[in-house]
């Protein structure tokens, strides 16, 4: 930080904020359309502005346009859909790709009461590889975090304790491998 910034921080001397971003927190789960409308609600104060559309809202729009959106009926259906839409996009993938993940999870939950065991196993197995360079390992860590999040959701998996342990173990091994690659890179640069 430069000296001016340090002084401003120490003396709490900042430019006044003229506009704050806002998103409605009183969501209407009576239907998908009602939920979408409540998310689109404009603030009622002139010093507030709506936040940019977030990942969860993009996912909601994606699911609402496909077959899974028709599965969301009533309060419970819309509320569960919104919970699924709030799966973080740790991978930073396209809204459509993230929407596909949300769609699959929501569809499985509605149709089978749990995310499909074979499907989650396939997703986790794909991440379970500690070889590769720094970028590859970083990507796998982001991917496994999605499945760790899913494993920690109440009642989403038939055997959540198994998947929590499995995803945590994979993430730990990937993190260790990434640390090793970063250390090696640092050592290689220092010795050359």
Which residues make up each language-model segment?
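Extended, charged helical/alpha-beta scaffold domains that provide interaction surfaces
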Residues: 69-192
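C-terminal or mid-to-C-terminal helical accessory/interaction module adjacent to the motor/catalytic core
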Residues: 1-82
């Amino acid at each position: 930080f430069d000296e001016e910034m340090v002084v401003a921080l120490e003396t709490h001397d900042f430019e006044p904020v003229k506009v704050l971003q806002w998103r409605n927190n009183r969501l209407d789960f009576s239907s998908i359309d009602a939920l979408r409308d409540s998310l689109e609600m404009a603030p009622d104060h002139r010093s507030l502005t709506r936040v940019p559309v977030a990942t969860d809202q993009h996912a909601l729009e994606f699911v609402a346009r496909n077959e899974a959106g028709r599965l969301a009926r009533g309060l419970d259906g819309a509320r569960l859909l919104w919970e699924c839409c709030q799966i973080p996009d740790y991978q930073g993938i396209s809204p459509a790709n993230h929407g596909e993940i949300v769609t699959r999870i929501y569809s499985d939950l509605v149709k089978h009461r749990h995310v499909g065991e074979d499907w989650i196993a396939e997703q986790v197995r794909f991440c379970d590889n500690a070889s590769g360079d720094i970028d590859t390992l970083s990507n796998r860590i982001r991917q496994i975090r999605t499945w760790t999040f899913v494993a920690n959701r109440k009642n989403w998996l038939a055997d959540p304790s198994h998947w929590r342990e499995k995803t945590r173990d994979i993430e730990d091994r990937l993190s260790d491998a990434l640390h090793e690659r970063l250390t090696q890179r640092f050592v290689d640069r220092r010795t050359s």
